[in-house]
């Protein structure tokens, strides 16, 4: 059976998948599976209750994401540990969601996934990632906006094999926010350097050139 996390028969039906949901998950993701979750780890993730999904009141799954523990030796958690994010192996990282093109509840889904992850890992840190796709910047900006609107904070932009860069988000914000230091676009070459200096983005705006991240420091 599927564990029900939250249910609204009209719009939202978030559930933690078990192995019984493997076929439904495969129908949503196709042969590629969930991003950054190696195919040979999917069965284990289902058995361990590490995949959250939403039917959104439909017969088929509409969205899904995996929560990978940082001690895992898969490429994603390994690269995060190497970059200093959860270097002790405690905590977890939420993979980018796969969703039906008509799915409209992404922000709600992300909030639910973060709440579930935070409860599951208690005091440990929760991260989320998003590949930077310069060649499809509007879609990348839209997903980043959904992440930030769901309560995530952009903390880093790191190189990662197979991507143009990996945006790294934290479920925790800075304790005290100062006034905005700078506004940057996702494709600005200065973004990674500013984030490395300890600045972070939890909010954004829209300008003539697209999404503008408001970079702030902790006071």
Give a label for each model feature:
Residues 1-55, 180-184:
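Short amphipathic alpha-helix that is part of the acyltransferase structural core
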Residues 3-6, 101-102, 128, 132-219:
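Intrinsically disordered, low-complexity, positively biased terminal segments
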Residues 35, 43-53, 60-98, 159-161:
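Conserved acyl-donor/pantetheine-binding loop and adjacent beta-alpha core of acyl/acetyltransferases
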Residues 55-58, 115-123:
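Secondary-structure boundary elements
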Residues 90-94, 118-138:
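Conserved GNAT acetyl-CoA-binding A-motif
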Residues 91-95, 99-119, 141-142:
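Conserved acetyl-CoA-binding loop-helix of GNAT-fold acetyltransferases
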């Amino acid at each position: 059976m599927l564990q029900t996390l939250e249910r609204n028969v009209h719009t939202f039906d978030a559930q933690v998948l078990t192995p019984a949901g493997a076929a439904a998950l495969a129908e949503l993701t196709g042969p590629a599976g969930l991003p950054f979750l190696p195919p040979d780890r999917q069965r284990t993730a289902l058995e361990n209750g590490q995949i959250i999904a939403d039917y959104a009141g439909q017969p088929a799954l509409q969205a899904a994401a995996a929560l990978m523990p940082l001690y895992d030796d898969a490429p994603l958690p390994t690269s995060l540990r190497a970059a200093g994010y959860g270097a002790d192996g405690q905590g977890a990282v939420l993979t980018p969601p796969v969703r039906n093109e008509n799915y409209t509840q992404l922000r709600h889904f992300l909030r639910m996934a973060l709440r579930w992850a935070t409860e599951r890992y208690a005091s440990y840190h929760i991260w989320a990632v998003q590949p930077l796709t310069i060649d499809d910047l509007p879609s990348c900006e839209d997903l980043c906006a959904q992440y930030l609107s769901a309560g995530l904070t952009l903390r880093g932009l790191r190189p990662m094999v197979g991507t143009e860069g990996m945006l790294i988000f934290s479920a925790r914000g800075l304790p005290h926010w100062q006034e905005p230091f700078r506004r940057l676009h996702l494709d600005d070459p200065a973004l990674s350097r500013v984030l490395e200096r300890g600045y972070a983005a939890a909010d954004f705006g829209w300008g003539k050139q697209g999404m503008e991240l408001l970079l702030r420091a902790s006071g």
